[in-house]
From Swiss-Prot:
It is a single-pass type II membrane protein. GO terms for cellular component: plasma membrane. It comes from Staphylococcus aureus (strain MRSA252). It comes from the Bacteria. Its main location: membrane. One of its GO terms (molecular function) is serine-type endopeptidase activity. This is Inactive signal peptidase IA. Pfam families: Peptidase_S26 (PF10502). It is found in: Cell membrane. The chain crosses the membrane at residues 8-28. Catalytically inactive. Belongs to the peptidase S26 family. The gene is spsA. Residues 29-174 are extracellular.
Amino acid sequence: MKKVVKYLISLILAIIIVLFVQTFVIVGHVIPNNDMSPTLNKGDRVIVNKIKVTFNQLNNGDIITYRRGNEIYTSRIIAKPGQSMAFRQGQLYRDDRPVDASYAKNRKIKDFSLRNFKKLDGDIIPPNNFVVLNDHDNNQHDSRQFGLIDKKDIIGNISLRYYPFSKWTIQFKS
């Protein structure tokens, strides 16, 4: 009888730990489409880290998952609160300086800036808002369609791709 009680206590404790980790630390996610191709492809399995959101540690270039209505999307942060942003002739400019990162150059995006967003006064991203963009230019399930992404809608940043095994990635390069 004591073994059964010990087993049940261990099982309940394990369930509580798993629920805590999935609620506050990390969660698994399957990439549902090719919005972030070639960086992430449909069917890739990733770990989403919730800690960077909780402690305001999101950076430009981070790949995040976020909610929009009942859907979950994956995009890259290209501008954070307090920054300005514009695309001119396929090049990303942040705070009026060209961004030297692979995701920011030679894009098929013509002209796009914060002035395209409705409900935004000025050229500076307000607190707790982000501009996100997909790596795949033709898919506009990002700030071009949704506008600013509120921090409260961000689930976390993708910190690990564990499947397919041949594409194991711990840290995504900008």
